[in-house]
Amino acid sequence: MSLKKFRPITPGTRFRVAASYDDVTTSTPEKSLVVSIKKSGGRNSQGKMTMRYIGGGHKQQYRIIDFKRDKHAIPAVVKTIEYDPNRTARIALLSYADGEKRYIIAPTGLEVGNTILSGPGIAPEVGNCLPLSDIPLGTVVHNIELKPGKGAAMARSAGTYAQLVAREGKYATLKLPSGEMRMVLVVCYASIGTVSNADHMNLTKGKAGATRWAGRRPRVRGVAMNPVDHPMGGGEGRSSGGHPRSRKGLYAKGGKTRSANKYSKNMIVKKRVNKRLSK
């Protein structure tokens, strides 16, 4: 995907950087793989607001994505590469030899007409999905399972990937985009390659309205609220609000949010460093 800049004929286009969508081959999704979703506006089933700053936005249809890739040893041909409004990556429509159609997250380099497979013992080529036990060390992967058979959970957003760095016994060690080194069972499946649309990180909305199109409302600062609404609210005139705190009164700015007793902590070999991997 390439980027598109605009002539500054309006304030909203002056700094806007948008996607060119030259990698998208069709604008009409597969009807059998689309379901309608109703916007919640940040409210739960009782009508009470449980998430602030959500509302409005363009109407969207959800594309059903195959994260399990459980049609083993059945070849599938890539029919289209499509835009998905529900995620940052592109999606690919597969047509299997038995007639079934499914959507998958499209990896970089996958093109219309390519044939891909999933299952044990297949070639580790871009788009193929196989268990970590069959993937050569050093291979870049995405759509990685955390629990066998549950479906992909890691490295699913645009441009992300992980690298298989070691394998010992029933565990494989992966280096994640955050720098974290994590052990995963070798029977878990992963797809070969990196996720498409890596230029997503370089997009610039250009105006506040573009954020509203995505269904996000303005976020009010805590120091601009009253004391009844936020621990940092109130004061005479403009004030700093004191020590930065969350709305619940917990210290903000760098505090640990992960539970120290989380069951999967033993799977983490090295903690993340908050820096993206460099190829």
From Swiss-Prot:
Q: Please name the PROSITE patterns in this protein's record.
A: RIBOSOMAL_L2
How does this chain assemble? Part of the 50S ribosomal subunit. Forms a bridge to the 30S subunit in the 70S ribosome.
Q: Alphabetically, which GO biological process terms does the record hold?
A: cytoplasmic translation
Per UniProt, the ranges with Basic residues bias are 268-279
- Is RNA-binding there in the keyword field? yes
* GO molecular function annotations of the record: rRNA binding; structural constituent of ribosome; transferase activity
Q: Which gene encodes it?
A: rplB
HAMAP family, per this entry? Answer: Ribosomal_uL2_B (MF_01320_B)
The entry assigns this protein to a family as follows: Belongs to the universal ribosomal protein uL2 family.
Note whether Ribosomal protein occurs among the keywords.
yes
What is the protein name for this chain?
A: Large ribosomal subunit protein uL2
SUPFAM superfamilies, per this entry?
A: Nucleic acid-binding proteins, Translation proteins SH3-like domain
Q: Which domain of life is it from?
A: Bacteria
Gene3D superfamilies linked to this entry: 2.30.30.30, Nucleic acid-binding proteins (2.40.50.140), Ribosomal protein L2, domain 3 (4.10.950.10)
Where are the annotated segments for Disordered? 223-279
What is the purpose of this protein?
One of the primary rRNA binding proteins. Required for association of the 30S and 50S subunits to form the 70S ribosome, for tRNA binding and peptide bond formation. It has been suggested to have peptidyltransferase activity; this is somewhat controversial. Makes several contacts with the 16S rRNA in the 70S ribosome.
User: What Pfam families does UniProt report for this protein, alphabetically?
Assistant: Ribosomal_L2, Ribosomal_L2_C
Fetch the InterPro entries from UniProt.
NA-bd_OB-fold, Rib_uL2_dom2, Ribosomal_uL2, Ribosomal_uL2_bac/org-type, Ribosomal_uL2_C, Ribosomal_uL2_CS, Ribosomal_uL2_dom3, Ribosomal_uL2_RNA-bd_dom
* Gene Ontology cellular component annotations, sorted alphabetically: large ribosomal subunit
Q: Which organism is it from?
A: Cytophaga hutchinsonii (strain ATCC 33406 / DSM 1761 / CIP 103989 / NBRC 15051 / NCIMB 9469 / D465)
- Keywords in alphabetical order: Ribonucleoprotein, Ribosomal protein, RNA-binding, rRNA-binding
